[in-house]
From Swiss-Prot:
Protein name in the entry: Large ribosomal subunit protein uL5
Gene: rplE
Subunit structure: Part of the 50S ribosomal subunit; part of the 5S rRNA/L5/L18/L25 subcomplex. Contacts the 5S rRNA and the P site tRNA. Forms a bridge to the 30S subunit in the 70S ribosome.
SUPFAM superfamilies recorded: RL5-like
Native source organism of the sequence: Actinobacillus pleuropneumoniae serotype 5b (strain L20)
MF annotations from Gene Ontology: rRNA binding; structural constituent of ribosome; tRNA binding
Function: This is one of the proteins that bind and probably mediate the attachment of the 5S RNA into the large ribosomal subunit, where it forms part of the central protuberance. In the 70S ribosome it contacts protein S13 of the 30S subunit (bridge B1b), connecting the 2 subunits; this bridge is implicated in subunit movement. Contacts the P site tRNA; the 5S rRNA and some of its associated proteins might help stabilize positioning of ribosome-bound tRNAs.
Gene Ontology cellular-component terms listed: ribonucleoprotein complex; ribosome
């Protein structure tokens, strides 16, 4: 079992229950899922790029990504409906907690010129989204085998009702928000 999950149950739940005066433990916000998305627009010209992106996302997440396809044709981007343009992974349960732990302890500190994550990236319902410019911050990616530096989007979906609750939840895990 992931250490952060134990920490959540033993410490964070009690802290947040006291802070927001919840009557039940079930009212305390929790992390529901973490979604990783990698858009590969260049996959239109070279199919190998999408395969490499899928391999990177598989190494980072530990599970096989779903290839996302264009929903509609856009002439300006030279894409047609159904073209593969990216990949995504939804992590839940044990894999989610393990990824979250690696994200906080290993990956985020390796971001170049890191000064903290923006606390304004909440969506109004307690969900947090962040972008990573380089996939090489994750230790699972071998720097020598990378053909191209790609970014990815990470969305942390919580059961929080407001941004304040969501931020308190992530801050309880020592999420590195900018001061």
């Amino acid at each position: 079992m992931a250490k952060l999950h134990d920490y959540y149950r033993d410490q964070v739940v009690n802290e947040l229950k006291a802070k927001f005066n919840y009557s039940s433990v079930m009212q305390v916000p929790r992390i529901e899922k973490i979604t990783l998305n990698m858009g590969v627009g260049e996959a239109l010209t070279d199919k190998k790029l999408l395969d490499n992106a899928v391999a990177d996302l598989t190494a980072i997440s530990g599970q096989k990504p779903l290839i996302t396809k264009a929903r509609k044709s856009v002439a300006g981007f030279k894409i047609r409906q159904g073209y593969p343009i990216g990949c995504k992974v939804t992590l839940r349960g044990e894999r989610m907690w393990e990824f979250f732990e690696r994200l906080i302890t290993i990956a985020v500190p390796r971001i170049r010129d890191f000064r903290g994550l923006n606390a304004k990236s909440f969506d109004g319902r307690g969900n947090y989204s962040m972008g990573v410019r380089e996939q090489i911050i994750f230790p699972e990616i071998d720097y020598d085998k990378v053909d191209r530096v790609r970014g990815l989007d990470i969305t942390i979906t919580t059961t929080a009702k407001s941004d304040e609750e969501g931020q308190a939840l992530l801050a309880a895990f020592n999420f590195p928000f900018r001061k």
